[in-house]
Amino acid sequence: MFEIKARDAMGRLGSITINGKKIETPTIMPVIHPNPKKQTVSMDLINKMADVVITNSYITYTTPELREIAETKGIHELIDFKNVVVTDSGSFQLSVYGDVNVGPMEIIDFQEKIGVDVGTILDIPTGPDVSREKAESDLIETFKRAEDSIKRRKEMGYKLALNGTIQGSKYLDLRQKSAEVMGKMDFDIYPIGAVVPLMEDYRYREVAEVILNSKMHLPTNKPVHLFGCGHPMLFALSVALGCDLFDSAAYALYAKNGRYLTADGTLHLKDMKDLKSFPCTCKVCSEYTPKQLYNLEEKEKTRLLAEHNLYVTFEEIDRIKNAIKEGNLWELVEERCRSHPKLLNGLRVISKYMDFIEKHDPVSKKSGFFYTGYESMNRPEIYRHKQRLDRIQYDKIYVTSVSENTSKPYSENLSNVPCDVDVLVKDSVFGLVPLNIDTMYPLAQNEVPDLYDFEKKYNNEFVSEFNEKHAEKILDISTYNYYINHYGKKKECDKINPDIFRIGKMLEYQYGAKILDEELMEKVKSRRSKNTGRIRNLLLEKEVLFTLRANDNFLIPAKSGAELLHEKLEFPKYRIVIDSSVEEFARAGKSVYSKFVKDCDPELRPFEEVLIVNSDDELLAYGTTILNGRELMEFDYGVAATLRGGLKK
């Protein structure tokens, strides 16, 4: 069972429950050698740091003394680990040696027998440089083994959860097919396999595309494991693309070669021995100087170096979790991807997939938008803004430029004549910023350095396309000046209230429909904060309809506002339909759980304001969705939406 607690980009801070044991994602599974004598780092330390580990059932199966202990005492006793144990099936050995001495059903039976929490099918790992015919043939065999494994588990009543590995080599359409076919089977976790050769060759662009083409066709309610990814420099990008689990033998393998892991690369201990101290504060690096560690006996040096590598690995996972909570995962990704040019290729290629990525990125975040480089232009916040500009119902448009020194929000720093013209400011990062919505996230909540000329020109094509699309409504400067001069001479009673006009446009941008018609615009009133002077509420007959949330200026509905949205928005827009059995809980303002969701607006994005209705479209409650439209229909565990209030009968 998997649920999402927090999110940013496509990264998910979640919880997996397996056999009553919980794993917080994203996380790393240290690779544990099934032979305790060959394990580099003590299991006492592993037990303190890890919620889940991965070991090899094939080595256990083919080593008589290990097999005997595992079959009599269980895998947890064999490796001395109390929490979740995942096992590989021999697929790695198959990829290296071309053959294994075990059948697909034998290894499933064995994994169940030794008490594995999560087993793995014996798939056919297909490297990146094989022919398409070979990749297709291997994939067909993997599908057969997968189907047989699921059938075996069901027929035998096995309790172990199963990994269903996604294959397809470098052929993206085969990765899509693999994800689609495997996704329809009842697997618990979906590893993306055979990417280690790509990572070893620094082919990170291909790694990113393999992940995304797999994710697009996998069920959203199951965790995704990037098999063989153990270097911390790759974690941030991989999490941002939707990977939840990683496994690392790198902490031990690198140590054996004298390699010292960092979050943004690898150093060699022999090259560090003349440094006064390590660039790390873990226990090992605090107790030893580089020279002291380098001069230790080889076995002890390897053990301590592996402990450092493991510490750095978990530290990066913790850093990513915090970034998800704070809403600045993209900034961390951009920082990490500048640690190697090939990794930057991986970041750049994802702009091709922004339509898919945007669907998973929250509409608002705790942190502002920080521009860290040209790649920031392709972030989902900007992509979404450009898409949602078309939600605004324009009558007259004036497009203008402002000085680079003009502070944001523009509307508070420009002498703009209040009128019914939508004034749009050309913006180097966001393309066009309508003054009436420019306090909304992320248009005002951003920090951008001085840009190079080529960066300033990035949005020229977008602005030209917008102007062409709305050519009939765009006023030139002479017409605009004439119009506002004429408008300014109107009687006060004939003028539109600029605050109400502004809120109307903000509602269009946020909800995609005209919420305030002409009749309502004459009745509603705005209320400004006594402290800041900014608009804080929209009221109808002294009753609050909407509150402008301080951190992002989103319009948050009160009860009457929810009723207004329900009236103005056509079904199923901004709705979640729930089962009749939980109607009373919704009316009482209790959270909506995923298993009770029957239908929804498929275009919902994470953290949007939503209306909770029954199958007759009767408004029951209102709140915030944690999941997007697709996830709402696929998740069957955890909270789907938190509620702000309910409507009593």
Curated annotation (Swiss-Prot):
Keyword terms of this UniProt record? Glycosyltransferase, Metal-binding, Transferase, tRNA processing, Zinc
Annotated metabolic or biological route of this protein: tRNA modification; archaeosine-tRNA biosynthesis
The entry marks the following residues as binding substrate, namely D123, A194
Query: Catalytic residues per the record?
Result: D88 (nucleophile)
Name of the top EC class for this enzyme: transferase
Pfam families membership: PUA, TGT, TGT_C2
The name of this protein is tRNA-guanine(15) transglycosylase
Species the sequence originates in: Methanococcus maripaludis (strain DSM 14266 / JCM 13030 / NBRC 101832 / S2 / LL)
The top of its lineage is: Archaea, Methanobacteriati, Methanobacteriota, Methanomada group, Methanococci
